[in-house]
Amino acid sequence: NKLPFDNFITVRPENIYASYMKKNIKSIVPELIDRLSALGYNILYLPRYKIDNLYFSQKNNVYVPPQPLNGLDICYYSTAVLTGAGTFAREAACLGVPAVSFYAGKTLLAVDKKMIKDGWMFFSRDSEKIIDYIQTKKRRNVSLERSKQVKNEVIDKLKAVIENL
């Protein structure tokens, strides 16, 4: 899938229908998209439900892909990733991409709390604070050496298991 723009912010809404969410939660995504759009940002919008497409598909600088895209590729090429969940934000943060969680659930996971505390990820449900964050936060340089080392260790262990069969 070719996106209609090279520079973009990825937005994924909250899963407001999930059982782990607070009751009667109101999504911040409409306000967030309106503000980002008014500031001239290109937005890759990844809806959870078909009804999510109705409002955002009308904007010129909002692209809703017709089919699923590879999440890690999206994170890597995004200027920032804003999501109403945690996994997507964690993946982006690990790649050095400015990552925002506006999760509306009852409790943040310990891993999210740690990443927020360490400055890898930002948490807010205030669209103004989120926009301030992405306007000032730049991509972090990330060393992939440790990842490569772990990958090689796993491969070596798998080879040893296979050889002993």
Question: Whereabouts are the PLM-identified features?
Answer:
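Donor nucleotide-activated moiety binding/catalytic core segment of transferases
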Residues: 50-88
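Active-site-proximal loop->helix
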Residues: 109-120
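Short amphipathic alpha-helical segments
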Residues: 22-23, 56-58, 93-96, 112-113
